[in-house]
Amino acid sequence: MNKPLILVVEDDAPVRNLITTTLKLHDYRFLTAANGETALMEASSHNPDIILL
């Protein structure tokens, strides 16, 4: 079974990188967005299981 798809929305690049590094260590699937507009596009096209803001 696949792990859930997580959308990480964070405008601060170092914080976003910290979150995604942690997710990679635990083999989670994730997408990133640096702003609300990109987050909406990613959410509508990929239908993530959870969104971290």
Positions of PLM-derived features:
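Conserved Rossmann-like nucleotide-cofactor binding loop
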Residues: 14
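Charged docking surfaces used in two-component/phosphorelay signaling
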Residues: 17-25
